[in-house]
Amino acid sequence: MITIALPKGALLSDSIELFKRIGLDFSSFLDSKNRQLQIIDPTNTAQGLLVRATDVPVYVEYGQAQLGIVGYDLLLEKSPDVAHLADLNFGGCRMSVAVPKTSPYQTPAELPPNGKVASKFVNCAKTYFQQLDLPVEIIPLYGSVELGPITGMSEAIVDLVSTGRTLKENGLVEVETLFHSTARLIAHPLSYRLNLDNLNDLSEQIKNSVSKS
């Protein structure tokens, strides 16, 4: 039986809808009364695991799940050893540099050498500023990153932005987009190569469904 890692949070509803279109029903995960983290589809074809978004690539890399859905942002941040199968065309957002609207720094390149940048995406932020050849200190924050500049702990942040509303409400503005992110279908490399449990057929059904939507 194929095991699929599904992400809690913003991507869950669209992920479940995608699988429903190919005949797999994990909609119980959307029930507010549900406490199960593992659900077998009524057809007994596959089972779903409900995990934190950051853990999806871990379950897939280690083979506890053969398929998973995860944001492109996490694939760049974590660089897991997984097979990248498809862009699922939902969950669109962007990784951006933002500063206070009153900041004297209106582009990332204007930030002072050894300035401070708060982010939960430490590797993405490091890579970006290394490419700029600008030495900065990346401060890892895993809660409300916007508080970095508000409290004076950092001059800027690197974070995911969807509508930009949270930034605006906290007096921040985007000054650069690092990349755009959408949900991606990933697979355990060996399972995919060996086509265990007809994994390739299922992944093709998913790709076909995405192309038709």
Curated annotation (Swiss-Prot):
Pathway: Amino-acid biosynthesis; L-histidine biosynthesis; L-histidine from 5-phospho-alpha-D-ribose 1-diphosphate: step 1/9. It is found in: Cytoplasm. It catalyses: 1-(5-phospho-beta-D-ribosyl)-ATP + diphosphate = 5-phospho-alpha-D-ribose 1-diphosphate + ATP. The keyword ATP-binding applies. Its EC number is 2.4.2.17. GO terms for biological process: L-histidine biosynthetic process. It is an enzyme of class 2 (transferase). One of its GO terms (molecular function) is ATP binding. InterPro entries: ATP_PRibTrfase_cat, ATP_PRibTrfase_CS, ATP_PRibTrfase_HisG, ATP_PRibTrfase_HisG_short. GO terms for cellular component: cytoplasm. Pfam families: HisG. Keywords: Amino-acid biosynthesis, ATP-binding, Cytoplasm, Glycosyltransferase, Histidine biosynthesis, Nucleotide-binding, Transferase. The keyword Ligase does not apply. Heteromultimer composed of HisG and HisZ subunits. Lacks the C-terminal regulatory region which is replaced by HisZ. Catalyzes the condensation of ATP and 5-phosphoribose 1-diphosphate to form N'-(5'-phosphoribosyl)-ATP (PR-ATP). Has a crucial role in the pathway because the rate of histidine biosynthesis seems to be controlled primarily by regulation of HisG enzymatic activity. Belongs to the ATP phosphoribosyltransferase family. Short subfamily. This is ATP phosphoribosyltransferase. It comes from Crocosphaera subtropica (strain ATCC 51142 / BH68).
